[in-house]
Amino acid sequence: MNGIIPFVILVLFSSNGLSSAGDSNSAVDIGKPGDAEKVSRTVKLTQMDNMFLPGEVKVVEGETIRFVIKNGGNHKHEMLLGPMTELKKAAEMRRKYPDKEHSEAHLVQLEPGEQKELIWQFTRAGTIDFACPLPGHFKKMHGTIIVEKK
């Protein structure tokens, strides 16, 4: 009996940890759509046909950033924020279903020459990735956002 209670507690904590680790609602982990009136600065990103420029951005926890994204390439591109595991899943889905339309708060779709904005608040310190998940683009078109502690 004495060994059962610690085992049950261990199982309960392990189950809780697994369920949150596998949570598909990654928007909570990467922040949330930001308020345009609370933007602290603007970061310009350019999408070329094989990379993002710059490939790394540093922000501070709690900061609201206005990303101005320009497609400087010759093909349609996307910019999707998320953990790399989720970006890989998105790239696989785009490969399997290339004609399916997507619309997430942490996604921007751009035609060649087009420019759009994404306003995002970074609520937790850590690393967040961004990528173009379109077929043939993902392997080279990705970057990192480093969210530093306040």
Spans of features found by a protein language model:
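N-terminal edge beta-strand
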Residues: 35-64
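Bacterial N-terminal signal peptides
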Residues: 6-15
